[in-house]
Amino acid sequence: NIMANFYTDNEDIKFHLGHPLMEKIVALKERNYTEAQQYDNAPRDFEDAFDNYDKVLEIVGEICGDVVAVNAESVDAEGPQVVDGHVKYAAGTQQNIDVINQAGLNGISLPRKYNGLNFPITPFIMAAEIVARADAGLQNIWGLQDCAETINEFASDEQKAKYLPRVCAGETCAMDLTEPDAGSDLQAVQL
């Protein structure tokens, strides 16, 4: 058992949370802290927001050190399988996803009205780095929640209400790239 915290043991990551521009970024993301009147988990000021980010990142770090990193080798050995036309994750991957879902770590940057945490993108990317350190493959799965930013930014209110709560609950998220002759041909992408 590793029993490490992949956030508290990384001063480089913690450094970015305290960047001087974060105060302006957070005030914008938090609409000058007006949501504190509507949501119990919304910060009242920058110090409150910073404390929220720090606590959530500490939880991410703890889960990654105590669960995800511990499962990484068995996840690589077992790998996913296709069963009856559906992907079945390795047992360790499923355990990782379950623990992350139980901790409420999906929808980190999505609005509170959809049960997201409404964090700026910087703490989300910090969390993504922590997850990647523990298991880069899991980061590819967990990080898909960032795709929901496109829905949040451009979808109708009806589409947002349909999909964003499900992303925040860890029920759904995918990035599908298909149609090499008519759309997204990833194999043909060149630098």
Annotate each PLM feature.
Residues 1-142, 154, 158, 162:
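Amphipathic, small/basic residue-rich leader segments at the start of a protein or domain
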Residues 117, 158-191:
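Glycine-rich, Trp-frequent "lid" loop and neighboring beta-strands that shape
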Residues 141, 147, 165-166:
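Conserved glycine-bearing catalytic or ligand-binding loops at nucleotide- and phosphate-handling centers
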